[in-house]
Each structure stands twice: as C-alpha cells, then as structure tokens.
C-alpha cells in the first residue's frame, strides 16, 4: 500500500493545483442542446471539457463507424478518426463527458503505439483485467472482478464469440488431458478499430455471460482511412523476440464514386513464448530429453495466424448505404507436448515408443450484410439492418506415435535397404553386402553378415514369404527382376541361396498395378492336386516398417446466425435533451462437439511402403493393399462420436436506452434489455453419444432386466437387455427423449446511471446495473457414467446473476483527469459441480456409481477501488508541453459464500471429524476467488514531440503478491492428511507435499511474488509515410510469475503440470525475460 499512498498523494497535489487553475477560468458549462445535424467538418480543436448531452452508458452494440448524415467523401470527424488510426502523437485525448463508469476504450492508435499483438497485450497496461491462461492452447478470454471465461462477455462487431464448455464436470474429465481446444477464440489485433473494456455487470451490451464485465471489439472500416483522399495503402513488418514472431500486414482502402473497399491481410508466424531461462538446456539433445512435468522449458510449438478482413460498401447517396464484410482468421499451433505427463520417461532421447504431436486450430469466419438509412424521420435519425453468419471451430488434434529412426516399429539395426543393380532389385545391409545363412552356426543355423556376426534377431527370417507379399508397382518398377532368398527348393531340399525372379504384373479393381513372384512347385503331387512348394522369401527387417499413429481429432463447433435492427434518435422534449437508442435482434447458435478417433501409419519405411499383403481368406489369397506386408491392418477408424448432444440456442432480444440531459449539470442514463434464451437439444445418429452414457440415466433397467454379460448366460426368468437388444435400444430411446427436454431463460437487464456536473472541474457518476449468464448447454445436458466419476444432467438450472453498484468522482481539466472509483459486485446462483452421492446404475442393482451434478449453489461479493488518471504536463506548465503522466490502480477483495456446507465435503468431514476437526472450519469458511487479480498499479511516463515525429513511453507495472489466504486449492481434500474411503474401504492417507512443504489446508499451492516490470516503447517518424516503432519489455530482466500463469497449473491430468512435491517444472510457467519488439510501417 505504500506505493499506492505515495501515488495518490502525488496525484492529489497535482490535480489540486490543476483544479484551482480551472476554477479560476471562465465557466464553460454552457448548454449544448443545439441541433445535432449540423455539418461535422468544423474545427475539432475545441476544449474537451464542455458538457454534452451524449450517452454515457448506452448499449454499444450499435455501429459507430457510420456517416453522420453527410456524404462519405466529406471531411467529417477528421480529428477523431485520424487519432484512432495514426500511430504517432498522444493516444489518450479523452472527452471526460463521454467517459463511462468502469469503462475503458482502447483505440487502434494506442494498440499500434504499444505494439500489441494479442489479447495479453490488449490488457497489458490495464488494471483489474487479465487474460485466462490455459497453456498450450493460449489465452481463453478474460478475468474481471472475480469471474472469468464464460462469465466475461466477448463480442466482435456485435456478435458473441464462442464460449468454452464450462461444465466443471467436463473440465474434470477432459480438459486436463489436452484432448480438447476448450478456449474462447481471439481476434487479430491489426483488425481492431476500438476495444471497449467494461468492468462490472454488462448484460445490457453483451447479453448472457457478462457477469463480471465485457470486452467488445469493433473492426476497422474503409471510411476510417479515406478521410480526405480516395485511397490508402499501408505495409507493416514487425518482429518480437519473446516468440520469434514475424508480422506482415497489408492494408488497402479505396473509394471510387459510390463504392469503397477495405482489405487487411495479416500473417503472424512464430513459436512458443520463451519463458525465463529459456536456454536452460545446453543443446537440442538435452532439450528433447527433458520431458514430463519436470521440464523447465516451454514446449516447442510453431504458431501461425492468418487473418483477412474485407469490407465492401456501396453508397448511392447520402441517405442509403449497403455493405458486406468478410472476417476470416485461422490460428494454428503445431508442436510436441514434451511436458506431457504420460510420456515414457525411460525412452527420452533414445525414443522407442513415441511422443505426442499436436496440431490445434482455431478458425473463425464471419460474413455480414448490412443496410443503413440516414434519412431523418419522427422515429429515427439512423437505422441499420444487418445479417451475420459466423462459424467458429476450435480443433485439438493429437498424434501419438514414434517418428525417430530408433522407434521399435521401424527398427533396422543392420541398415537393410533396397538397391537396383542392372535391372534387378536387391536387399543389402548397411555395407552394401548380402546376408548369408550358415546352417552350421548355433543350434539350427543362423543368418550372418559379412563379418560372420549373428543377425537373426534383426531380420524377419520366418515371414516375407513370396506368396504372402505383393509389390506395389506404383512405387517400384515391376519390369525389373527381384533377388529373393530361397531356403528350400520345390523338391524340399536345402538351398540357402539368392535367386533373381521375374515380377508378374497384375491389376487391382481400382486400376492400380501390383506385382507378384510365384513360388515354384514340384512335379510330383503330395496328394490330390497339392504339390510341394519351395520356401522362398524377402529378407525384410524384423520390425513392421511403420509406427502406429493414434489420432484424436476433436472439434468444438459454434455456428451463429443473427439478424439485427438498430435505431437511434435525438430529440428535445420540454426542456430536456434525449439521445435514444433502441432495437432488437434474433440469434440462433448451434453448439456441437465431434470426436474422431482413428489409427493410421506414420514414419513409414521402405519395406512397409513398397509392399503389401496377399491375404489368405477361406483358403484363397487376395490382394489387400490396406494391409501391411505382414498382413496387419494399417489404418483403423473408430468412427465419430460425441460426449455432448448438439444444442441449438435461440435468443430473442429487445433493448431500449435513453440518455436524458435534464439540465446543464444533471443527466440520467436509462437503459433496459430483455433476453429470451431457448435451448433446443437434438440428436445426430451420424455422430452418436456412446449408448452407455444414456441408457439407465433417468429410466432405470428393471430388477429382472439382464444387462451385463453375454446374452447366452442370461438366467431363464430374466429379460435380455444386453447391448443392442430390443430392450436395451428401448431404454436408450426412452432416456434420450427425457434428456432432450427444451429449456428456456428470460432476463430483464438494466443499466441506470446518474451524471452530475456541479462544476466545470468535477464530475460525479453513479451506476447501478445487472447481468446474467444462462447455463451453457454442456452444464445442462452433459452426461457421463464411470465407476469413479459420473455426471447427471440438470435441466432445472437457474441463470447466474450479478449486480453492480459503482460511484466515480472525476477531477479534470482539458485532457487531464483523475477518476476515483469504488464498486461492489454481487453474484448469485453460481453454477458448480456438486457431488450428489452414489446412485444405482439400474433399479434394484447393488452397483452404485458416485454421481455429480451441476447445481446453483454459490453466491459471491467483490468490493474494490480503482484509480485512473492522466496528467498532460502542458496543462500546468507551458514548457512541459508534450509530457504526460499516467497512473492506474486496482484493489479488490472477494469471497464465495455457501448457503450451507458444500455437499462435497460431507463424507470427507464425517470420516475425519475425530482426528482432524480443524477441517470443518476450513470447509465452512468463505472460499477465496482465484479469478481476482492481486493489487496492481501501472505508472506511465511519456513524451510526444510537438511535431509528432517522435515520442517515447515508459510503463512501470507493479503487482503485489497473491496472498495465501486469498487463494484456493480445489483439490485440498485429496492432498491433506486424511482418512478416505476407496471402493467402500476406509484407509488412512498421508498428506501430499507441495514444493517441499506438507499440504495442511485449502490455500493455493502456487502463487506469485510481488514484482515490478518496466517497459519502454518509442516511435520515430522521419518522413510522413514512414514510422518506426521499437520497445524493450521487461527492461530489468526481472524473473517473475504472473498470478494467472500460477493458477493455470494443474494438480490432476497430463498437461500444465509440475512435479508437485518438489516444484520442478515451475520455471516453464515464468514470464519472458528481457525481450524486444520492433516494427516499420509504410503508408501512402
């Protein structure tokens, strides 16, 4: 708190001086209720502290890049739009009267000046908001005021973005194993015109999900660039050392008569973020040998993002505009999960069995059509009708196979290879020699190399028979001969010699050619038409010649269609000014999951790739190109399935907002929104849910139903209900019908504000708002059955709600201000996974599974204070024109409170009440909120030259340590010293060790220490069309761990783990050391 007190004192003194200067000046709070449809190309360098009757917290899902009733080739809003797009110059010319409570707007100009490249950089110099870290799949949304991910809204151009599968059951079962890309998609920063961050309940703008706040993005438009000209061209190159990312961005904007177009194409190519001590391993071999949770270096990934934004507009006159937009982006991550917990440690560096190769993708494609009308009517000044179709796919693909030459599946110690000499194929060893057979060596003879060494264990001396192996003529020239090894001739006599044989070419049904070499037959039949055949073979290596690739390909799909109508109108009524916005939309979203598991071949060697099986079936051999030369099936497909039934969400919305200016010093914000959310579950037989997850779910099997075991073992007086029986299918159908129940949620959102301007240097704002989050489809409908962890659906869940109360005091002069803000957020009906106890899997059965269910359980409260300030030194001293100071601060506290004892603790406390009575106090105390950030301060000192040709900014971020009492370990009951029950048997368990210390309570295991990070960024504009930007980040090379990275460390699963007992592997989660960024941009 020392830094805070000092900073507050300094700011108070500065603004007291500032306020006295302002107070002595002439009053500027003149009425502004003049007609608003005047030409807008007037000078804009007027003082910004004039009272205005503009909305201060209206819904922001309105288009903000529209013309202001003027032709698009006029110089309207020149100052405002240039300020957002250009890089040079001051980046925070804020109109205090338009600044909203708990809201921050970040412009494209500011993002470019700070060299922002992703969502982390977006909030890098903000307080009270951070990104949610997930490890390999990157960031997943934001954490604001104690809640995160789906409880913080994200919108792009009026469309909600994909939500995660937020069911705690899903996270427990699947998320910790890296098989799903269960993250919220991000946006390409180069496409962003403005990003609006709202802290506090915000369902008015974002609808369901904005409990703690929202982040709303608006993308760029051609009219942002075509201010006083008809074309714009920009090419930007950038590089950053923390992940070796190369940036290429091409921007084209043009206008011809009634048409305008914008194209922004961006490519980012880099690798994983380099943690502190990234070069800890001396060489590549040591790096690859460092595997499992103890690995201290970030896993190697290649990360690319390709994004294209195209907007085409047609404006036949000043009153009508048609436009179409395409926003298409793909984020791809390829690499190796070296820290994967199930990787075989003993084979690291000398790989025999395999490793985990990943290929994750996050794809987003949005097509939008819109019509705008600017004709003034009694009902609107501007109307916009738009249709959007957005498809988002988050894919996680993992391939587990061995791709080294030392792999068991491709082992070839003798280096056998295929050579062609004089039109003859020969198999020779690594020295180019043929192997020979010495029948006098060993017990039964043996194959030897030229040096007389035994090679029997390295070659397949019993397989490769000529009648079972066929040659792929697409790969080898079947006009050649092939040298084969003959053990016995057609008379059954020993031979042990090589012979050259002709290849007989034949054709497969698909038209492809293959070759075969027939075995010679003796002249005298053994019996009937059976003759003695020679024993001849290809001498292949003993291994299969390929590695089996176990593929998990899993997609989470979110497809949204939306039609929206927005209207706005400004008018005077009696002696009050009104700025009215109203409208509504209809939105339909389909959420689905597709799991595709199959096995294929990888690391294929010559003896597997050039030959295939002549399969013996019913006494006859048939060519089988899908089978290896050993007649084993190489590719198997387990098919597609899902653990979540497809659910269509329909959302009907109406909203109304009015900013009322009662007097020159008193204004009201009155905003309302109505949401009606319907969930319509369905079932796709082509992508089924495993039958066992649904049968017996609601409607149990009867006591006389025989379900398990072979139907042939069914007792005489029982009904056959084994898998795929009519009884089993009927139970599945009945339970599916009960599961597919429709659910709906209705919510009335409001945002009420009071704006007071008692003087021309003080503004007081009050805000009271609410928000809601309808349960996600997986929280309602997900089902799972397993002897150790089962999930029961719950179609009776209530929506989560939140209420925000805020008061803000702003002292200002011109562009200088300080805002002191106090807030309280109250949350209700938190959805959490609750243990509902063991339940029989069928009626009358003694077999019971431990079932869990999502239920409304928790309530929470978060309180805090925030400070946001900026001082333009030129407002105090003329000689310091261009210098500016900034300070941001957030302090917040919160707890989750139960209405009673959490049911999941009931059995644990009962078992341990005698030896460990202290556990009950731990279980009953309010639970800390891990999504609350530690106390954070950001200082900014900068200078922009009057010529705006160069400037520099220094940011100092100070983050307090996360206190142990403010952190929570959800697995504490399985880590403390305890008595536990396993399969009905009670046993004593010793406490786990975390980082060398015994776990004794529910405090989080990994927390950040206090740290201070300094960044310095500068720009230089030597000529009008050229801008250089460069920065040094973490200037002092501080080693630090962020709280969001610390809380992402898992205690269960196979990814994002460390060795809990010792803390080995923690270094992998540390932030980068000193790193650099630079960019150059050409503009014409």
From Swiss-Prot:
Belongs to the TonB-dependent receptor family. Hemoglobin/haptoglobin binding protein subfamily. It is a multi-pass membrane protein. A motif (TonB box) lies at residues 83-90. It comes from Haemophilus influenzae (strain ATCC 51907 / DSM 11121 / KW20 / Rd). Residues 95-220 form the TBDR plug domain. This is Probable hemoglobin and hemoglobin-haptoglobin-binding protein 3. A motif (TonB C-terminal box) lies at residues 1067-1084. Residues 26-77 are annotated as: Disordered.
